[in-house]
From Swiss-Prot:
This is FMRFamide-12. Keywords: Amidation, Neuropeptide, Secreted. The keyword Protein biosynthesis does not apply. It is found in: Secreted. GO terms for cellular component: extracellular region. Belongs to the FARP (FMRFamide related peptide) family. GO terms for biological process: neuropeptide signaling pathway. The modification Phenylalanine amide is found at residue 10.
Length: 10
């Protein structure tokens, strides 16, 4: 559901 690089949001 989230963008591919959304995990980089820190």
């Amino acid at each position: 559901s989230a963008p591919s690089q959304d995990f980089m949001r820190f």
